[in-house]
C-alpha cells in the first residue's frame, strides 16, 4: 500500500508532466489533479509544496541538472524530466527529508510511470545532484 507522501509525489510528478506536455497554467493543473478520485489518499500540503515549488523554480533546476546529463535535456523522456525536476525541488527546498528517501521515492515513481530502465538513469543523476545540493549530507553515507 502506498503512503500518502508517495501518492503526493506521484501526483506532483503527474502535474509537472502535464505542465511540460500541455503548457497549461499551474492552478488549472492542480485543480484537475485535486479532482482525481485518489487525491484524498495524498498529503495535500506535500503535493502543493512539490508541484508549485517545482513550477516556480524549474528553470533554476534545469540549470542544476543539465551538466549532469549524458544527453541534451530536451531529449529527456518527459516522465524522467518531471521526476528529476520534482526531486531537485525536494532536495533543494525540503532539508527535513533525507536525500536517500528523496532518491528512493523518485526511483519508485519512475518505476511506476517511466520506461524500463528510466529508474537507473534517474538514480544516477539524483545521486550526483544530491552531492551538489547537500554536500554535507552525502558524507554521512
Swiss-Prot record:
- Choose one Gene Ontology CC annotation of this protein and give it: cytosol
Q: Superkingdom of this entry's organism?
A: Bacteria
What does UniProt give as the signal peptide span? none
One example of the protein's molecular function in GO is: RNA binding
The biological processes this protein is annotated with in GO are: DNA-templated transcription termination; transcription antitermination
One Pfam family this chain carries?
Answer: NusB
Q: Is Transcription among this UniProt entry's keywords?
A: yes
Q: Its family?
A: Belongs to the NusB family.
Question: Cross-referenced PANTHER family, in alphabetical order?
Answer: ANTITERMINATION NUSB DOMAIN-CONTAINING PROTEIN, N UTILIZATION SUBSTANCE PROTEIN B-RELATED
> Which NCBIfam families does this chain map to?
nusB (TIGR01951)
What this chain does, per the entry, is described as:
Involved in transcription antitermination. Required for transcription of ribosomal RNA (rRNA) genes. Binds specifically to the boxA antiterminator sequence of the ribosomal RNA (rrn) operons.
Q: Which protein are we looking at?
A: Transcription antitermination protein NusB
Organism (species): Neisseria gonorrhoeae (strain ATCC 700825 / FA 1090)
